[in-house]
Amino acid sequence: MKNTLKKLFGALAFLTLLSAPAGENLFDSAKIIPGKFGTWDAETKTVRVSIPHGTKVSNATEGVRFVPDNAKFAGKTVKFSFKIKTDDVRSIGGKNFHNAKLLLAGATKNDPYWRGSKGFTGTNDWTEVVWRLPFYGDNIRLAAVFGLQFATGTAEFKDIRAEVCDPFEAFRLKQKLPADFKCEYSPAVRNAPRLRGVVAEYYVFDDPTAFDTLEKWNVNVVRLWLGPKGANLNYKTYEAEMERQFKRLKELCPEFEKRGIKVIMTYRVPGGRYSNPQVFGTAGEISRKDNELSAFRIFQSEEWLNLFVRIWENAARTFRNEPAVWAYDLLNEPVQTAECRWNYLEVQQKAAEAIRKIDAEKPVMIASNYWGGVDTFIYLQPLPLKNIIYQFHCYLPGVYTHQGLRDKMKRIKEGNPIRYPSKVDVFGLHAAHHTVEYVDKERLRKNFQPVLDFQKKYGAIIYAGEFSVIRWAPDSDRYLDDMVS
């Protein structure tokens, strides 16, 4: 499997060498093979798959197989698009991927790989699906199957296309900035002292000794978490709960000010994510399976997005004249891997613009895509607003920083922990491109090159919102020293 991740779906640095003309439908020249339950209408260019209820089905995807010219996919990002209509599709296998969809069945050499688009069950009218995927290497064997996986019922597919595209199109803002754009900062923000601190929940400070501890640690900033735990989906009570927590933070502000500790406030996004991802997040490769289910609902739901913006407006009104609150940190670790109504940057832009109508000066922090990753700075765009700070989180390599979590401490108990520095798995953009490398201080430095390039190009201020290593990892002190040196 890891060979496929390296050779089939992977590094986007190779995506500028186009062998297919822009706009060409790569399926037009594909070999089309209808299966037992699938038909292809060449005149209307429509796929129909119908599996009667009661039919014995398996995990195989039954339908119509398209076998394109694989050479045209090599080293490209390809946008797949189609419209799907379903009639009483029932999941028989019971998994969330047992449905009607497009399945990409790929391989390099003898290493198989499957990846599915958004799937559908039940009865649905025509719905458009757009899906972008990068392909790496020149030894690709790929087939696209439009059909039903471990499911029965009827599905139709039309307007079927696959075309080479801009790999970062789905993540960009619509407006263009001047070629010589530079970020604008007030002197107070540009000349602010270097901030050093920790992340904490607001209720930690119900214990007054927490302030003493931070003073001993020489902390001058806290990235402070607010928001109701486990209530992200309760629309009716969310705003009232945030008002209560804003009031509590307001009560704490005099003590923060007295201790010389600034607050960067952030809060749990209303609506949450489509799934509850594990704790791995920025740890790259081990977060790969979370994928699109880790996207926030505000990327698709206008109702939740409006609430998200409204709460930030309330925060600006409450804290614009509060010196202890230094910045608004808008969105914690966004994850966007597919087309959305509003992409990860657009939702932050909406909130930032709303804040600026109320508070013109206090810094606003923008997070990079894919868990605040450092590599996604290669397509991050600056906002044309004053005092915008750009944030990353970094737990790389994740197999070292988060060791013991995925395997239930197996390697630790066996006395075979992952050490630093050492040769480990390293994953690239969107955790798709896999290599095995020796990771030391110089390799860590290489991780941050996209951030440095962004900083120099736009004159941006950068904030390292999170980085650390799990406490039982050997050589953790050396790792942290290298990260900050």
Regions found by a protein language model. Give the residues of each.
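Extracellular glycoside hydrolase catalytic/binding regions
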Residues: 197, 310-313, 317-320, 324, ...
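Surface-exposed acidic, glycine-flexible loop patches that form ligand/cofactor-binding
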Residues: 71-73, 137, 213, 317-319, ...
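Extracellular and organelle-lumenal recognition/adhesion modules and their flexible linkers in secreted
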Residues: 21-183
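Hydrophobic h-region of N-terminal signal peptides that target proteins for export
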Residues: 9-21
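Bacterial N-terminal signal peptides that target proteins for export
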Residues: 1-9
